């Protein structure tokens, strides 16, 4: 109880109550103050409960709190008699009643807020059946039930969206970005429309463009179907290969094996399968059923808090301790008799456990073998699709590895030579750049000097003359060469070309294969990038379209709610208009019978009747006031007379009693002797 009070005080001192209590001040609160604290906690859960209990009677306060606690599904401890004491304690503000309620409410405040909010919309209003005979009331009640179901669906969807990780800020940013993009697209469309309208036959061109778009979509759809059919064919080929491998393995086993070994293997499989079916699977099924039964039982029970769980854990520990004690007593009582039986039982349980472990290990090994076989078939299919060859095995694979190693060494050498050439080329390119820069600076300096001296263009003309003379000398040299030199050179070149061709023939052949593979890898990379970009674009388009669909659905729901609301208002106005027209017809009608049916006539008749009744009552009141004084005197006289008669009766009874015989009674100044 002290922990309960401490938790209540700590919770009341926090937000949003800020009561600033301690254990002593909280324990010293009176009944009215405790009820006000309870009402404040209930008002935090349901704002409708925010009232001052001093303005209510205790019965009204208790009724209001009990109704809200019933909605929140609070279960008071005890049976029906305890329920009556609970109600009485709630009326008078009893601490043993209010403390558990406060503890329960403060433990589950967030959950109870949600429950109170939902109860405001989901508690159905009970309409009497006689009122439902009216069509308007029945239609309104039906719309009310439909709106309640729609609220349930929307609330469920809202909770799913809250738990899905979408934030409202991100959604708003996305909506604003989409609106901006929509405006930009609309502007672009308008500009394109204006630009297209000036072109001749633009309608025909638009029609052709529309047909082109439809055909492209159809082409994409057909490509998608083709890809799906390829996937189906690939899966079918995989299944065929798997079945062929199984058939091959079975044929191989049948070719090598004898009938005795086959029968032995089949007997082992039958034993294993019968054990799995008769012993292992029924036990697992029974355990799963028990677990399912326990889970269903837990789900059907109301939600429990931390204190309830601690209480259940303590009960479970106590029961386990009692079970252990009983087992120890039984073992002590039956130990000399059942010594051998317990030994046999232990051995049987050990053997059964080993059997179960081996069965599980065998099952796991079979599953692992099947998965490895599937993986091998997938890898073989991938290699066959990549280069169209079968997977190498044994000596072929070794020869392929040795050949690949020799080629890799040659490739490394060639790669090293290419790297050296690249480095030399970079060095020469850098020196060329430096020389060009230096030449430009010298040319610039030379031009400035020529401009200063007044002979601009001299260096250019001199360079041209030198170039022309050099060309002329080269031409002269070329003319001076003899035909013998040319023939020798041709022979040398031909011999060199033939040698190089013979030396480079295997390299060119290997290079051609490598180039084909490189082209395939490049095409694969290009296709992969195209696929990734296309997938990203389609994903973004899909997300945009989903957001647009969600927004349009929300708009549709809003428009539907507006439509239902306007229909209700129209029906109400039609009913009022019908009543007003009926009233006007009855009021304007010359028939007195119709006029009597009019509401105005009925109200005027009721008013006159009430006025006459008021006059009669005022006259009666006046008569009562006039006769009030005499009647009060008369009533007083009657009461005095009753007292006098009662006194005489008492005196007479005293005279008649036997105790008064022989006594002298003096009354009214006279002496009497009663015999």
UniProtKB/Swiss-Prot annotation:
- A GO-annotated cellular component: cilium
Q: Which Pfam families match?
A: IFT81_CH (PF18383)
Map out region (CH (calponin-homology)-like region) in residue numbers: 2-121
Give compartment(s).
Cell projection, Cilium; Cytoplasm; Cytoplasm, Cytoskeleton, Cilium basal body
Keyword Phosphoprotein in annotation: yes
Q: Does the keyword Kinase apply?
A: no
**What remark about domains does the record contain?**
The CH (calponin-homology)-like region shows high similarity to a CH (calponin-homology) domain and mediates binding to the globular domain of tubulin.
Q: How does it assemble?
A: Component of the IFT complex B, at least composed of IFT20, IFT22, IFT25, IFT27, IFT46, IFT52, TRAF3IP1/IFT54, IFT57, IFT74, IFT80, IFT81, and IFT88. Interacts with IFT74; the interaction is direct: within the IFT complex B, IFT74 and IFT81 mediate the transport of tubulin within the cilium. Interacts with tubulin; the interaction is direct. Interacts with IFT57 and IFT70B. Interacts with RABL2/RABL2A; binding is equal in the presence of GTP or GDP. Interacts with IFT88. Interacts (via the IFT74/IFT81 heterodimer) with RABL2B. Interacts with CFAP61.
What is the documented function of this protein? Component of the intraflagellar transport (IFT) complex B: together with IFT74, forms a tubulin-binding module that specifically mediates transport of tubulin within the cilium. Binds tubulin via its CH (calponin-homology)-like region. Required for ciliogenesis. Required for proper regulation of SHH signaling. Plays an important role during spermatogenesis by modulating the assembly and elongation of the sperm flagella.
As for family, the record states:
Belongs to the IFT81 family.
Q: Which PANTHER family match?
A: INTRAFLAGELLAR TRANSPORT PROTEIN 81 HOMOLOG
**Protein's name according to its UniProt entry:** Intraflagellar transport protein 81 homolog
The organism encoding this protein is Rattus norvegicus
């Amino acid at each position: 109880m002290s922990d309960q009070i401490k938790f209540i005080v700590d919770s009341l001192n926090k937000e949003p109550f800020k009561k600033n209590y301690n254990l002593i001040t909280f324990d010293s609160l009176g009944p009215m103050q405790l009820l006000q604290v309870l009402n404040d906690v209930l008002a935090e859960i349901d704002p409708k409960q925010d009232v001052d209990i001093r303005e209510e009677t205790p019965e009204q306060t208790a009724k209001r709190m009990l109704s809200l606690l019933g909605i929140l599904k609070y279960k008071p401890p005890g049976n029906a008699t305890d329920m009556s004491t609970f109600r009485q304690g709630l009326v008078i503000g009893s601490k043993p009643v209010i403390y558990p309620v406060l503890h329960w409410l403060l433990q589950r405040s967030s959950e109870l807020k949600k429950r109170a909010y939902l109860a405001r919309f989901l508690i159905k209003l009970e309409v009497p059946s006689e009122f439902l005979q009216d069509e308007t009331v029945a239609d309104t009640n039906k719309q009310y039930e439909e709106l309640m179901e729609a609220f349930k669906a929307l609330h469920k969807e809202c909770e799913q969206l809250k738990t899905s990780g979408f934030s409202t800020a991100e959604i708003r940013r996305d909506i604003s970005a989409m609106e901006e993009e929509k405006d930009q697209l609309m502007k672009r469309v308008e500009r394109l429309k204006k630009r297209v309208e000036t072109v001749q036959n633009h309608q025909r061109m638009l029609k052709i463009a529309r047909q082109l778009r439809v055909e492209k979509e159809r082409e994409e759809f057909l490509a998608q179907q083709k890809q799906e059919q390829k996937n189906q064919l690939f899966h079918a080929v995989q299944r065929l290969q798997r079945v062929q491998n199984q058939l091959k393995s079975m044929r191989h086993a049948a070719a090598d094996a004898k009938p005795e070994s086959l029968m032995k293997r089949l007997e082992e499989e039958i034993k294993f399968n019968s054990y799995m079916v008769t012993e292992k699977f029924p036990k697992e099924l029974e355990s799963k059923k028990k677990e399912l039964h326990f889970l269903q039982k837990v789900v059907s029970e109301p939600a429990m808090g931390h204190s309830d769980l601690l209480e259940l854990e303590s009960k479970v520990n106590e029961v386990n301790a009692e079970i252990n004690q009983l087992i120890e007593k039984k073992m002590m009582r039956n130990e000399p008799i059942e010594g051998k039986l317990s030994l046999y039982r232990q051995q049987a349980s050990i053997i059964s456990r080993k059997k179960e472990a081996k069965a599980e290990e065998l099952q796991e090994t079979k599953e692992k073998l099947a998965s490895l076989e599937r993986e091998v078939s997938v890898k073989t299919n991938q290699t066959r699709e990549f280069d169209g060859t079968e997977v190498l095995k044994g000596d072929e694979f070794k020869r392929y590895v040795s050949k690949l190693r020799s080629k890799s060494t040659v490739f490394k050498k060639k790669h090293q030579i290419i790297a050296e050439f690249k480095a030399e080329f970079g060095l020469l390119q850098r020196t060329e750049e430096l020389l060009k820069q230096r030449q430009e600076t010298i040319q610039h300096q030379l031009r400035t000097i020529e401009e200063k001296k007044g002979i601009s263009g001299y260096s250019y003309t001199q360079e041209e003359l030198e170039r022309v003379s050099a060309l002329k000398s080269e031409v002269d040299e070329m003319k001076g060469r003899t035909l013998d030199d040319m023939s020798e050179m041709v022979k040398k070149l031909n011999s060199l070309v033939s040698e190089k061709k013979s030396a480079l023939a295997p390299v060119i052949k290997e290079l051609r294969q490598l180039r084909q593979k490189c082209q395939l890898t490049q095409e694969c990379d290009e296709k992969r990038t195209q696929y990734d970009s296309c997938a990203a674009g389609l994903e973004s388009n899909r997300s945009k379209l989903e957001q647009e669909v969600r927004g349009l659905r929300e708009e549709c729901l809003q428009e539907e709610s507006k439509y239902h609301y306007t229909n209700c208002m129209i029906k109400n106005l039609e009913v009022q208009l019908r009543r007003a027209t009926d009233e006007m017809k009855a009021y304007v009608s010359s028939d007195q019978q119709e006029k009597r049916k009019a509401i105005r006539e009925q109200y005027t008749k009721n008013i006159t009747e009430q006025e006459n009744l008021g006059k009669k009552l005022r006259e009666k009141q006046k008569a009562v006031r006039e006769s009030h004084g005499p009647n009060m005197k008369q009533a007083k006289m009657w009461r005095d007379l009753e007292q006098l008669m009662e006194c005489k009766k008492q005196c007479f009874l005293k005279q008649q009693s036997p105790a008064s015989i022989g006594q002298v009674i003096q009354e009214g100044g006279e002496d009497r002797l009663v015999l």
